Amino acid sequence: MIMTEVPEGLNYTKTHEWYRKDGNTATIGITDYAQSQMTDIVYVDLPKVGDKKKAGDVLLTIESVKSAEDVYSPITGTVTAVNEEVAKHPESINKDPYGSWLVKMAIESEGEHLSASEYRKLIQ
């Protein structure tokens, strides 16, 4: 079994997104487990700054050599920043899924989320 990294201090979703709260801002990415299942990531279709999303809405799409996967918004809010570096170098998600954030959003409300220990149980 491959061990995947699940850092403490982040919130996780059942659809394999992570987010870190900093005041009223959420920084969002995909988990180590998600990137390992997708294999080599080749393209990220980021949303636009100003896009409004509800928790559970499709936030963006990531394409790998294996498949195209939707990434779902873990919160309800407005996109305030996108990581253009990830768009230019999508493989960075494979190398560092927790350092390669995808978007930042202003939080209106949070959706359902899991702690690190709950997420570890989900992916075992």
Swiss-Prot record:
Keywords recorded for this protein, A-Z: Lipoyl
Residues modified to N6-lipoyllysine: 66
Domain Lipoyl-binding: 25-106
Positions of disulphide bridges: none
Keyword S-adenosyl-L-methionine belongs to the record: no
Gene Ontology BP annotations: glycine decarboxylation via glycine cleavage system
Claim: DNA repair is one of the keywords in the record: no
Record Pfam families: GCV_H
PANTHER family cross-referenced by the UniProt entry: GLYCINE CLEAVAGE SYSTEM H PROTEIN (PTHR11715), GLYCINE CLEAVAGE SYSTEM H PROTEIN-RELATED (PTHR11715:SF3)
Function: The glycine cleavage system catalyzes the degradation of glycine. The H protein shuttles the methylamine group of glycine from the P protein to the T protein.
Similarity field: Belongs to the GcvH family.
Protein's recorded name: Probable glycine cleavage system H protein
Native organism: Thermoplasma acidophilum (strain ATCC 25905 / DSM 1728 / JCM 9062 / NBRC 15155 / AMRC-C165)
